[in-house]
């Protein structure tokens, strides 16, 4: 699942997505598909619920809001000040080609991104949704304001990119 919201002092993982969306001036190009999402508050509730309610070695899929990419991108674009910018769904093969190109660029610079971006298309172009009744509800997770959490994440991404705030990145740099 995608997690939105902010953690004081930490760089959001979504900076790359904001950079990508900002780089496209006339329209946003993105594949079909979508995923499940939770807020940072809901993650904390799920962890607490697992500690307090779980009996035995159970695994719980955590997801509350199932959203297609077009919906997510429309929210992000609103927080970036470009509401209503056209979102164009690209074919899966085009996403695969872009992944192959990026992988070659990474290899040329001796970078191992950790993902085979060409093979990521099968996942990225699917609707990877989770029913909240399978994990969140049994653990006592409550509804939260997903759009607000996305907005907070995007605002912090912009602040990081424009160097208005200092944060620690994912690698602890």
Spans of features found by a protein language model:
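Loop-centered beta-sheet repeat module
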Residues: 7-12, 21-24
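Short, hinge-like loop/turn segments at secondary-structure boundaries
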Residues: 13-17, 104-106
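A conserved pocket-lining segment of Rossmann-fold NAD(P)-dependent short-chain dehydrogenase/reductase
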Residues: 17-38, 46
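Short aromatic/basic micro-patch
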Residues: 34-37, 66, 129-130
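Mid/C-terminal beta-alpha module of Rossmann-like enzyme folds, strongest
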Residues: 44-114, 132, 140-173
């Amino acid at each position: 699942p995608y997690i939105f919201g902010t953690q004081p002092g930490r760089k959001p993982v979504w900076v790359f997505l904001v950079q990508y969306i900002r780089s496209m001036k006339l329209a946003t190009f993105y594949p079909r598909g979508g995923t499940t999402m939770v807020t940072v508050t809901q993650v904390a509730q799920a962890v607490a619920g697992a500690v307090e309610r779980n009996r035995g070695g159970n695994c719980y899929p955590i997801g509350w809001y199932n959203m297609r990419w077009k919906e997510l991108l429309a929210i992000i674009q609103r927080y970036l000040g470009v509401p209503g910018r056209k979102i164009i769904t690209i074919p899966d093969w085009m996403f695969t080609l872009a992944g192959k190109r990026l992988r070659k660029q990474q290899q040329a610079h001796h970078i191992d991104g950790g993902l085979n971006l060409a093979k990521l298309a099968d996942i990225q172009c699917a609707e990877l949704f989770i029913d909240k009744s399978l994990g969140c509800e049994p653990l006592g997770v409550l509804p939260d304001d997903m759009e607000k959490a996305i907005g907070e994440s995007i605002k912090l991404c912009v602040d990081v990119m424009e160097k208005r705030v200092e944060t620690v990145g994912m690698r602890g740099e």
